[in-house]
Amino acid sequence: MYESLQQMQEICETENKAFWELVMEEEANEKQNSYEEVFEMMRSMYRAMVQADENYDDRRSASQMTGGAGELMAKWNRDEKTLSGPFLGQVMERALKMAESNACMKRIVAAPTAGSCGVLPAVMITYQKLEKCPEDEIVKALFVAAGIGQIIASRASIAGAQGGCQAEIGSASAMTAGALVFLRGGSLQQIYEATALALKGLLGLVCDPVAGLVEVPCVKRNVIGAVNAVSCSDMAMAEITSFIPVDQVIDAMDEIGRNMPCQYKETSQGGLAVTPAGKSVVL
């Protein structure tokens, strides 16, 4: 287990390895599998994401709070009404669809959590489809995301109950930003800059699920995490940097999470959950 992204960068430079290779090798050693087996396991994760996207339907959740937003966004995209263009339009659509599928208890891939399951797939699937990216490159990008997520989990948290929504949507957005920079041919330093920028932008985000369900505001926050990742990848590719190094940003998230009142950490005792509309939900 590596202790920091800085440590991983130093190893990559010393051993002349790509970041994704380092992550894959660690996973193979831990599971006692071959590199090929681990690579194919990750491919199966990506294909499960694609299948979840393709199997979306616009049914509403059991609570009736969510459902159908993904199809509404799809129609908006088909009508070419979005100001954000085809890429971001499809990213938003897929993020909604994946998160709504989770709310309806359908099969998804936690990335890193079920509540943030729409962020990484939305960007990866859209990139593959619109940029005609080979599947193998997407799989490598998922290893990049996994390596970033591993460090966030070890230095801070990826659980809303421990660190608030910054730990879920924030982590997913950071992982996705780094993975996208990799796909776009950015350097490891640019991957780290995108990761830091994405996480910084979502620091302090609380976890305040209405009625204790992973629906409101969780579904639509997946869109925010995905769009944030894309914008931060653009900034990093433009050579814009984070004044605070990535490992220190992760540590800041941990500090914020530790000091965040418990009513903002998945207890449904604060924020949107205790608004009149939030308290009106009867299950």
Say what each PLM segment does:
Residues 121-132, 180-185:
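Alpha-helical support elements that line or immediately flank enzyme active sites
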Residues 143-175, 179, 202-228:
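A structural-propensity feature for long, helix-poor, extended segments
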Residues 82, 111-114, 136, 160-168, ...:
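Alpha-helix capping and helix-loop boundary segments enriched in small/acidic/polar residues
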Residues 85-102, 137-156, 201-209, 244:
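Acidic-glycine-rich active-site phosphate/pyrophosphate-binding loop
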Residues 182-283:
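Functionally critical mobile loop/hinge segments
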Residues 105-123, 167-172:
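Conserved phosphate/anionic-ligand binding catalytic regions in large, soluble enzymes, centered on
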Residues 83, 110-117, 127-129, 133-134, ...:
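Glycine- and small hydrophobic-enriched segments that form the cores of compact globular domains
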Residues 1-106, 130, 239, 246-283:
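Generic N-terminal targeting/processing segments that precede catalytic cores or assembly contacts
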